[in-house]
Structures are given as structure tokens and as C-alpha cells.
Amino acid sequence: MRILVATTYTLPGYSGGWTTPLDLFDDEHRAMYVICNAPRKRRTVEGVPVVGVGVRGLLSRPWKRAERLRRAAEDHLFRRTIERCFDDFQADFVLCLDEKAGYSAMRAGLPYVMRIHFRGGHSDDDPILRRILDGAVFATSCHTMHVEGAREIPHNQDLSRFHYRESPRAERALLLTGINPVHEPEVFVEGIMSSKSMRGDIVGDGPLRGRIQQMCRQTGGRVRCLPPVLRLQVPQLLDEYQIGVATGLKIMPVWYQMKVNAYMASGLYTITRPWTHVAVEAPDLVSTFHSPGELGEHLDRVSRSWEETLPVRRRARDWIHRNYSVEVPRRMFRQLLWEHFPKEMSR
């Protein structure tokens, strides 16, 4: 099938809203992306056409005296871009990754499916969210999000891309992240510097990049801030590290952080916040921290007792492949498509 993916915030090539839908589709479906907050241009990323709506600058910030007008203009621009791309791509339906995208597809009168990657603050009984879900052909959400009326389908990535390695020593830690307040990258910098000798890299992009780069310059080379890498290049990147770190504020009771799955599949020892999904589901496979100082202590302990972590790393690899295989959501998604789009699926 031909699927137009509509989203507000996705970073093409990098974020979970890019990786998990494309891994879900595999080679069975063709995709095109419309991204509300991306620059207004058309390009191709990993062979996938991407159109930015261009809701930036003045339109991206609240207007004190005319906020309703600004929102109406933003919604209109997003909706018209979705309509145009739907026709140009000859799409079968729109896959919406958030409520804003779903609202635009609904207003456009197009067939749409909700695959909720991001909650925009609406509660389950919010009338706007209910209208969006009721108007969808079907709706799904991540298993840690619990949206009433949405089928829970894990947002798994294809772990077969990653190469499991058993490094002889632990010398460098990685934070693969969005560089924004929610992911608190400064905690990683402070944690590395509170350890005795660990070195680490932040790989990603986001609005705090300039400030984090400045912090890293003051570490004497122990912490670097590196550019993001594309989805298909992440396995090669992980080969250079031994410890994977996941920071992040407690924005939900259980936070699904896809990077942790990649860490574990690649043989990295994982240190994460206690509310990350794996820390809740398999606490014996990771270490958790509440403060930069505690992160530094874990880094020292793991480095000092690296060989002793081997059984844990092996169990983590087996557990993540067993519980987060992409074949499970692919099978569930395929079944839903056959139920709701039998003619298109049989083409």
C-alpha cells in the first residue's frame, strides 16, 4: 500500500516517528512524509520523499493578541499540504502520528489511521481527541501510552540491523538523544564528569545543541557533542561504544525509549532512568540512576567490573530480541490492514 505519514515534530532519518513506522512497513508498503514543523521544501531521505509544511518563524510561536488566528493559519497550511501530497503520492490513507496530524486529516476528509507517537496534552475524554479517534479507520498507540479506544501495537524497530559485540573493556559511553529539555542531555555531561575517567559522546540534534556543545567544550575532551546519524547508520555507530545511557524527565509513568532496545541488541550495558520501559519490565538487566552523581558511580562500577557484566549483557540481548521483535507489530498491523483495506491489500 501507499501510506502518507503525517506528523508534527518528526526529524526525518533520526527520530522514533521515522524509524518505527518505516521498520513497520518494511518493503511491503511505500511511504511519504508530511512534517508540520519541518522547513517548507521537498527532499528525499533514505529513499523516502519528505515534504515540510514550513510552520516555523512567526507561525510557530504564540501570538499574544491573535493566537486563534495563528492556530487557524497553521492548521490550514498543514491540512492543505496533506491534501496536496495525498493526491500527488496517490496514497491509500494517511497515517497520523499525533493528534494535530489526525485533526488535519479529519478536517480534510481523507481516510486516516492514528498511530499515536506523541500526546499533545489531550486527556482520553477530551472531545477533540474522541472526535479524532472516532473518525479514524482504526487507531493504535504504543504499549506504554494506554490511549482508550486505540489498539496497542509495540513501536519496535528492526533489531536484526544491530550487531552484538562483546568488547574487552568499557572505555566510552553513548547518549543517543534529542538535544532538548525533556531528554536532559546536561545530566549525561555532568554524570560523565563526576566519574573518575569515563569518556562519552552525545549524538543527536535539537534546540539545546548550542548550550550542550558549550558544556562539552569545558570537559577537556571527555564529552563530545556529535551530529546525529541516520537510522540505517546507527548500528555502525553503536559498535564504537560499550555503555549506553538513557536520560529523560518523567513525562509519563513508563517512558518507552527505543534507543535502549538498540543498546541492548548491540551488547552495550545500559544505564537509564527508573521510568524507562526496560527498567520497569526487566530491572535486573539495567542499572538506574536519579542524579548525575549516581550516574557517575554506575559508570565507574561498570568500567571497573566490566567482565562481570557479560552475563547481564547476554541476557539483555536475548530478552530484547524475544520481547521487542519487529515481527510482532508487523503481524498485528498487517492484520488490521487486511480487515480495513482488503481491496488495497490484495492489489
Predicted segments, located by residue:
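N-terminal subdomain of nucleotide-sugar transferases
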Residues: 1-42, 193, 275
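A charged, aromatic-enriched C-terminal amphipathic alpha-helix characteristic of glycosyltransferases
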Residues: 304-342
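Active-site proximal beta-strand in glycosyltransferases
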Residues: 3, 93-95, 105-122, 137-139
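Nucleotide-sugar-dependent
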Residues: 183, 232-234, 244-262, 271-281
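Conserved donor-binding/catalytic core segment of Leloir-type glycosyltransferases
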Residues: 4-6, 165-201
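Nucleotide-activated donor-binding/catalytic signature segment of Leloir-type glycosyltransferases, i.e.
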Residues: 210-238
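Acidic anion/phosphate-binding donor-loop and adjacent secondary structure
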Residues: 124-126, 150-172, 184, 334
